[in-house]
Amino acid sequence: MSPNAPAVDIGAAPSLDTPEGDTKQPAEDHVEKDSNLVDWDGPDDPEHPQNLTRLRKWGITFSLASMTMWITFSSSVLSVATHPISEEYNVSTKVMPLATTLVIFGFALGPLCWAPLSELYGRRLPTFLGYGVFAIFQVPVAVAPNLQTIMVCRFFVGVFGSSALSVGPGVMADIWDPVDRGIATPFFFAANLLGPILGPIIGGFITESQLGWRWTAWLTLITSIFFGVLALLIVPETYSPVLLQQRASRLRRATQNQSLYSFLDQHRPTLAEFGYKYLARPFMMFLLEPILICFTVYLSLIYGILYLFLEAYPVAFAEERHWTNKGIAGLPFLGILVGMVLGIGIIIYNTRTRFARHLAEQGQVAPEERLVEMMLTSITMPIGLFWFGWAAHTHWMVQTIAGVPLGIGLFVLFMQGMNYLIDVYLTLSNSAIAANTLARSFLGGSFPLFATAMYHNLGVDWASTILGFISVAMVPIPFAFYIFGARIRAMSRYTVKAGNGIGPPIP
């Protein structure tokens, strides 16, 4: 039984305050005490979601990844339409980054609704309900008569789109065993970061074409409907408590034994419990936990830089290099994309080698082992930032390649940082991630608001240099917690104590 859960972009979907990934373990203590409790018929129960075929599991993984990619794509796609939108509505270009920021703020608040719903009704209902409304809100953006309509609808795009973002990691934990999850989850979360990179590239070409900027929303609607319907056909309900509740209902009808019940029938969370788990306890943990505070600040910087560069790249390439075609000016984002792909390889390779070796030799892996990849790649992000800034007056290819180390750092640091928080807080990881998500999204979402002014006033070189120095200041964090993390955990009331390990690795 593993106490781990995969990393999450905007908050993990919980499992009744138990760790994700535990659902395959039968509740033996309940079975012994009460024969009316409906549970799995052992680990090989054919209805258990982890016993789906590998083909079906990969189909579920890539279906959800496709959905989340288009959700995050929508957050950045309007970043390249600043000038045509501001000209059409006769407003200042300075307000346009708000169209991106409001989506990210929606990403922060949405999981407060979707995560509790996934505990009560399972994964499918909140995922597809939210995704459907997310798609519908593309229509008023596409036909908006004024800027206010765009801004309001963009916020709700984030709120409803966050359903798949927040519930998706729970699905990964439901269907994959801890070892295989180490291969599947990097692909899922890479799709979350791929969307914001593709947004300005595809959006730039659409904006420059005869279709115009409004077709960025129409394209999002069309692709969302296609991949949403595909996922609706492929993705089943995977949340064990709800599946057992459905089994108990079927058995009551078949046997006429009304005494049969499932765990969820008797332990349905209350509104007060949800409020404590997602509001009160996250707030207390954020104030009292040095691990949570430090990693939230670090991950907020990473998240903010990703979205800040949506405004910085147009300054560096469209304005400074006079690339007038917005689609062409967005192609340098491919450098970051290449770096993220390399980051996936780094995580998977280390999972199948170093982590597997530790697990085989020791039977468990300490949470601090997550930080090895962070330590190795922590310098790549500042290298990418310094490189990007001081290559502003060199050949464009030199500046584009700077995105490779930047992409490696963004992906590996973010993913392993989130995994470390989950491993450290285990059964309370939902509260820790809720605190991290709120702070990270609000702090990171504010970066696009000052990005353009910062790069205009300081120049590409010095603006990137300042960000580079800030990221250098964050480099000691994984090193410090790798050395002192066990001692800090020993003093905490919320974390795994010193000496405790975690089960099979799940990066």
Curated annotation (Swiss-Prot):
Belongs to the major facilitator superfamily. CAR1 family. The gene is acdC. PROSITE patterns: MFS. GO terms for cellular component: plasma membrane. The chain crosses the membrane at residues 58-78, 95-115, 125-145, 155-175, 186-206, 215-235, 290-310, 328-348, 371-391, 395-415, 442-462, 466-486. CDD domains: MFS_Tpo1_MDR_like (cd17323). Gene3D superfamilies: MFS general substrate transporter like domains. One of its GO terms (molecular function) is transmembrane transporter activity. It is a multi-pass membrane protein. It is found in: Membrane. MFS-type transporter; part of the gene cluster that mediates the biosynthesis of aspcandine, a pyrrolobenzazepine alkaloid. Glycans are attached at residues 51, 90, 257. Residues 1-50 are annotated as: Disordered. It comes from Aspergillus candidus. Keywords: Glycoprotein, Membrane, Transmembrane, Transmembrane helix. Residues 21-36 have a biased composition (Basic and acidic residues). It comes from the Eukaryota. The keyword GTP-binding does not apply. InterPro entries: MFS (IPR011701), MFS_dom (IPR020846), MFS_trans_sf (IPR036259). PANTHER family: MAJOR FACILITATOR SUPERFAMILY, MAJOR FACILITATOR SUPERFAMILY (MFS) PROFILE DOMAIN-CONTAINING PROTEIN-RELATED. Its main location: membrane. This is MFS-type transporter acdC.
